[in-house]
From Swiss-Prot:
Annotated InterPro entries: Arg_MeTrfase, MeTrfase_PRMT7, PRMT_dom, SAM-dependent_MTases_sf
Family annotation (PROSITE patterns): SAM_MT_PRMT
Transmembrane segments: none
GO biological process per UniProt: chromatin remodeling; methylation; regulation of DNA-templated transcription
E.C. number(s) listed in UniProt: 2.1.1.-
Keyword tags: Methyltransferase, Repeat, S-adenosyl-L-methionine, Transferase
Record-linked Pfam families: PRMT_C (PF22528)
A molecular function GO annotation: histone methyltransferase activity
Gene: prmt-7
Function: Arginine methyltransferase that can both catalyze the formation of omega-N monomethylarginine (MMA) and symmetrical dimethylarginine (sDMA).
Enzyme class at the top of the EC tree: transferase
Name of the protein: Protein arginine N-methyltransferase 7
Gene source species: Caenorhabditis briggsae
Length: 656
C-alpha cells in the first residue's frame, strides 16, 4: 500500500510504502467523523423522518412489511456506524440494507449492527449505491440517505437518489429527506472579498496585474456563524436559488439554470454571495435540518462541521441601489453550484490567471492581508532600504513589497507557475530592480540581506514553513555566516483552549440516540494511541472558544544557518477547563512579531486567530481528558524537517 506524504525539507510530494501491518483504522481515526455522529439535531430529525415514513409504508403495503435502504457516501459514517440502519430497524422496518463504500467503516457497521438486537434485520454491503444492481430480493420502500455536503449536491446526491429510485426502489418509494432548498444572500463584505480578489500592491480597484480574472466558481465552505455582523452587509433578503425533489426521479435534473429576482434593501456592491440549505425530513414541511448561520437563525441554530455554509463570487462586479429589483442567474450541474449576472455568460467560470487555481482561498486572503498591513510593509521598507535583497519561499509575495525601497531584489521561487505570475507583476508595476530565479544555488552574488515571511505554499500547518531554515542553510554555506537574515528567530507556541464545539470532531461518541456505538470509539482511540499524536490543521478563526491560560513557548529556532534537532517538554495547565491545544509559529521579523496563530485575546478571553493560516490543534484522547495538567513533548527532527508531538499525563512526583 502506498501513502502520499510531503517532504517538509523540499516541499515535494512523495509516495511512501506503508508497513504490511498498516492499520486502515488509523485513517479512520484521522478522518474526524466524531462531530457527524454527535450532530444530535441531525440525528433526531433523521429519526423523525423515519418515524413518519415507516408507519405510512406499513399501512400502505398489503403485507405490512417495509424494506429500508440506507445509503452513505464515503465522507459520512451514517452507515459506517450503523446509526441510521439501527434507527430504521428500531422504528419497525422489517429489513434494512445498508451501503457503505469505505471498508473500515463498513466493517465497523457490521460489528455494531451485528451486536444489536436488530442484527437479523440489517445487512451491510460494501459498495456504492450506483454500483449495486439489486439489494437482496425485494426493492426498497424507503430510502434514508445522508449523501450531502456543504453544496448539498456535491457528493453526488442527485445521481444517488435518481438511480436508487430507478433501480433499487419500488414505485412510490419514500425518501428521507424528501426535498431540499438552497438559499442565497448577496452581501457587501471587504473581508469576504479578500478571499478571492487578485492581490493589488497599491490596493487600487483599477489595478489588474494578472488581467481581469474573476477566479474560480468553486465553493468556499466556511463557518459563516463566526463572521462578525460588522464584517458584512446583507443587500437583500434570502433568495430561494434551487428546490430539489428527492422523491421524484423525473424531477431530479442534473443541469439547470434559473433567473431569481430580489429587491435591494440597501445600496452596495455584491462582493460575495452567501449560501446555505435546508432539507425536509418528513415530507410534510414540519421537520427540517436548517443550515442557516447562527446570526440568521439564532433560535434553531445547530453547530456542525461536516456541513458548513458557503460563499460564492460573481464573475463580474455588480452594484445595486436601494429598492432596485435585480436578478441573479443560479446554475447547477450534477455536483456543483455557481452564480452569474443576467446578460453575462452563465457558464461555469474558471481561473485564467493561474493564481486562484493554485492557491486556497485562505492563501489569497493571506496575500491580500499582507499587502494591507501597513506595519509589515513599513518594516519591509526599512529592512530593504538601499540594499541588495534576496527573498525565499514558495508563492511568497514579500519580494514584490521589498522592491519599493531595495536597490535590487532577487526572488528565489522554485515553483514555475509562480515564477510566471511574479514576472507578470514585475512587468505590470514596472519593477526594473526585481529578478526571479529558480533555485537558491542560482544566486551568484552575495546579497546584503535575505528576507522571508516565511511562506511555502506546500505547507499544511504553521511549522511546515520551517523549510525556510533549509534555504537559509544553503545560502549561508554559499555566502558566509555573516549573511543577514530576517526573520531571525522562530518560536513554536501552544495554549489551552475551551472550544464551544470544535472538539466534537475528535470526541468519543459512546451512546447516540439510545444506540451503543462505543465500538467506533474503541477502534478510533486504539488507532490514535498507536501513532504519534494527531494534530489537526484547522482555521481556528471559524471556531468559537475561550483560551484558558497564556501561550507556552515550546521550541525556538534561531535562523543562523545551523539546523539542529530540538526537543522540549512543555507543561500545559488548566486542562480541566480546556478541550484542545492550539499550536502555531511566531517569527521575529526585524522589530515585528509575526504570528501565524494567536493575534490577540479579548477581555473575555476570546482569541483572535490569523485568518491567513491554518493552525495546529490537538484534542486530548480519552485517558487525558480529565487531567488538570498534561505534558506536551515536541521533537523537531532535522533529517525530516518535521515536528512530532506526544501528549502524556503530568507526573506530579517527578515534575514531568
Amino acid at each position: 500500500m502506498f501513502l502520499e506524504r510531503v517532504n517538509q525539507k523540499t516541499g515535494e510530494r512523495e509516495w511512501v510504502v506503508a508497513q504490511e501491518d498498516y492499520d486502515m483504522a488509523q485513517e479512520l481515526a484521522r478522518s474526524r467523523f466524531g462531530d457527524m455522529i454527535l450532530d444530535f439535531d441531525r440525528n433526531d430529525k433523521f429519526l423523525e423522518g423515519l418515524k413518519t415514513t415507516i408507519p405510512e409504508k406499513k399501512k400502505e403495503n398489503g403485507d405490512g412489511l417495509v424494506h429500508v435502504l440506507d445509503i452513505a457516501n464515503i465522507t459520512f459514517p451514517g452507515t459506517g456506524t450503523g446509526l441510521l440502519s439501527l434507527m430504521a430497524a428500531r422504528e419497525g422496518a422489517d429489513k434494512v440494507t445498508a451501503l457503505e463504500v469505505f471498508k473500515p467503516m463498513g466493517d465497523c457497521a457490521r460489528h455494531i449492527t451485528g451486536c444489536s438486537p436488530w442484527a437479523e434485520k440489517i445487512t451491510v454491503i460494501s459498495e456504492r449505491s450506483t454500483d449495486v444492481s439489486q439489494i437482496g430480493g425485494t426493492a426498497a420502500d424507503i430510502i434514508v440517505a445522508e449523501v450531502f455536503d456543504t453544496e448539498l449536491i456535491g457528493e453526488g446526491a442527485l445521481r444517488t437518489f435518481k438511480e436508487a429510485l430507478q433501480r433499487l426502489a419500488k414505485p412510490g418509494c419514500r425518501v428521507v429527506p424528501s426535498s431540499g432548498n438552497v438559499y442565497i444572500v448577496p452581501v457587501e463584505s471587504h473581508l469576504l472579498k479578500m478571499f478571492n480578489t487578485i492581490p493589488r500592491i497599491n490596493g487600487g480597484e483599477d489595478e489588474h496585474p494578472l488581467g481581469t480574472c474573476s477566479g474560480t466558481a468553486s465553493v468556499f465552505d466556511v463557518q459563516l456563524s463566526e463572521l462578525e455582523t460588522h464584517e458584512f452587509r446583507e443587500l437583500a433578503e434570502p433568495i430561494v436559488a434551487f428546490k430539489f425533489d428527492f422523491e421524484n426521479e423525473e424531477k431530479i435534473i442534473y443541469n439547470e439554470s434559473f433567473v431569481r429576482e430580489a429587491i435591494a434593501h440597501t445600496s452596495g456592491t455584491i462582493d460575495a454571495i452567501m449560501m446555505w440549505w435546508d432539507i425536509d425530513m418528513d415530507g410534510k414541511g414540519e421537520t427540517f435540518i436548517d443550515m442557516a448561520p447562527r446570526w440568521k437563525n439564532p433560535k434553531h441554530y445547530a453547530w456542525r462541521d461536516h456541513w458548513m455554509q458557503a460563499v460564492y463570487y460573481l464573475p463580474d462586479k455588480k452594484c445595486v441601489e436601494k429598492a432596485q429589483k435585480f436578478e441573479i442567474i443560479c446554475n447547477h450541474d450534477e455536483f456543483s453550484i455557481w452564480f452569474s449576472d443576467v446578460g453575462k455568460d452563465s457558464t461555469r467560470s474558471y481561473c485564467v490567471c493561474g493564481l486562484h487555481s493554485m492557491l486556497s482561498r485562505q492563501t489569497v486572503y493571506h496575500i491580500n492581508e499582507m499587502f494591507e498591513d501597513q506595519s509589515f510593509r513599513a518594516e519591509v521598507d526599512r529592512l530593504s532600504s538601499g540594499l541588495n535583497v534576496v527573498t525565499v519561499g514558495e508563492g511568497s509575495f514579500v519580494g514584490l513589497l521589498a522592491a519599493k525601497t531595495a536597490k535590487t531584489v532577487t526572488i528565489i521561487e522554485p515553483n514555475e507557475r509562480f515564477r510566471d505570475i511574479f514576472h507578470k507583476y514585475v512587468l505590470y508595476y514596472n519593477m526594473k530592480n526585481v529578478h526571479i530565479v529558480e533555485k537558491v544555488t542560482h544566486l551568484i552574488e552575495k546579497p546584503d540581506i535575505v528576507i522571508a515571511e516565511p511562506f511555502y505554499m506546500s505547507a499544511m500547518n504553521p511549522w511546515n514553513h520551517l523549510r525556510f531554515l533549509y534555504d537559509v542553510e544553503i545560502l549561508k554555506m554559499l555566502h558566509g555566516d555573516d549573511l543577514k537574515v530576517e526573520p531571525h528567530l522562530g518560536t513554536l507556541k501552544a495554549i489551552p483552549e475551551c472550544f464551544e464545539d470544535l472538539h466534537k470532531i475528535a470526541a468519543d461518541v459512546n451512546t447516540v440516540n439510545g444506540f451503543d456505538l462505543s465500538y467506533f470509539d474503541r477502534i478510533s482511540t486504539k488507532a490514535r494511541a498507536a501513532t504519534d499524536a494527531i494534530v489537526d490543521e484547522q482555521s481556528l478563526w471559524e471556531y468559537a472558544g475561550t483560551v484558558k491560560g497564556e501561550p507556552v513557548e515550546l521550541l525556538t529556532f534561531p535562523v543562523d544557518g545551523r539546523i539542529l534537532s530540538r526537543k522540549c517538554v512543555g507543561k500545559m495547565d488548566n486542562m480541566q477547563s480546556s478541550n484542545g491545544i492550539p499550536i502555531w509559529m511566531e517569527w521575529q521579523f526585524g522589530d515585528l512579531t509575526l504570528s501565524t496563530g494567536l493575534l490577540s485575546t479579548s477581555e473575555s478571553r476570546k482569541p483572535c486567530w490569523n485568518k491567513g493560516y491554518k493552525q495546529g490543534v490537538y484534542f486530548p484522547i480519552t485517558n487525558l481528558q480529565n487531567e488538570s495538567s498534561i505534558n506536551l513533548n515536541a521533537l523537531f527532527d532535522k533529517s525530516s524537517g518535521d515536528i512530532t508531538f506526544q501528549f502524556k499525563k503530568f507526573d506530579v512526583q517527578s515534575g514531568n
